[in-house]
From Swiss-Prot:
A GO CC annotation given for this chain: pilus
Principal cellular location given in the protein's record: other
Protein name: Major fimbrial subunit
First and last residue of the signal peptide: 1-20
Gene expressing this chain: hifA
Pfam families noted in UniProt: Fimbrial
SUPFAM superfamilies attached to this UniProt entry: Bacterial adhesins
Compartments where located: Fimbrium
Record keyword Disulfide bond present: yes
Family in the record: Belongs to the fimbrial protein family.
SS bonds (residue pairs): C41-C81
Function: Mediates adherence to oropharyngeal epithelial cells. Helps the airway colonization process.
Amino acid sequence: MKKTLLGSLILLAFAGNVQADINTETSGKVTFFGKVVENTCKVKTEHKNLSVVLNDVGKNSLSTKVNTAMPTPFTITLQNCDPTTANGTANKANKVGLYFYSWKNVDKENNFTLKNEQTTADYATNVNIQLMESNGTKAISVVGKETEDFMHTNNNGVALNQTHPNNAHISGSTQLTTGTNELPLHFIAQYYATNKATAGKVQSSVDFQIAYE
C-alpha cells in the first residue's frame, strides 16, 4: 500500500513538472466569444433553396480581370422577426442580415468571389460570381476558410476586442421594427472576370445563415 501511494505521488509530481515545462513559444490558446439573442427570424420556406439565373453575356464583356457583367437582383425573405420579447431587451438584436459563406469555393485571390463550380467539358474559364449589396456598389466578401477578419490578439489572456469586427460579414443589414411579419433582403449577383474569360457554362453556390447585430 505504501509503495503504491509513493508511486502515485511520484507520478503526480512528474505530471506537474511536465505541464510546467510546456514551451510557450510552441503552444498557445484560443478564446472564443459570442452571443445568443432573443430574436427568432426564420427564412421564408420558398427562399431556403433558391436558383438565380443570370442572362447570357458575351465574353468580350469579361475580357479583363475585375470586369463585371449582368448584375442580377435576387431577394431572400425573412419571417417572424418581431423584436418584441417577453424576456426584456437586454439580449434583443437591433438589426438582422445574412452571413454568406462557403468552405469550398471562395476565391480569396479574387476579392472573395465564388469560383465557377461547373465541371462539364464546356465550362467557362476565368469567370466567378460576385455578390453585391442592393446598392450595386458595395461588394460582399463571402466568408471562406481563409477569412481572418474575426480574429483579435489577446493581451495577457484578455481579448483586446470581444465584439464583432468592423466587417462582421453581415450583408443586407436591416433595422428590426415591431410588427414586421416579412422582411425582404435584397442582393445582386453578377459575373466577375478573374482574367480574360472564355465561353462556357458558369455555376456556383453559396450558403447563408441569419445573423444579428
